[in-house]
């Protein structure tokens, strides 16, 4: 249920796409990499730190957040391979597309919605993206 709510909240209004020339991809990709590394070690408290204040407020505890990721985004919890694709700006929001190969070899693409809090980038939501020609 939380996954559906989370995906719905962040899927609304993301229609247009433009180049994200104002964003530096390095701190953004490091944030995502660090969260994925924390998930791989089952360090949900550390993974929770990379979530935005809104997401932390939605889930309340690292344990509930970790459970949501394990159940709703298992490819993020235990990826076999992670590749960073395009960084862009949509409707004024910074979106990093990530391709993940899961333990069974299946490819998944996800859009990570990023926000800057002070000098730090945080993950403000993740939405799965349909890959053309896969699973059709």
Give the location of each predicted region:
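Exposed beta-sheet edge and beta->alpha loop/turn motif
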Residues: 86-136
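Sec/Tat signal peptide C-region and signal peptidase I cleavage site
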Residues: 16-20
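Residue-level detector of flexible, active-site-proximal loop/helix-junction positions
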Residues: 11, 54, 130
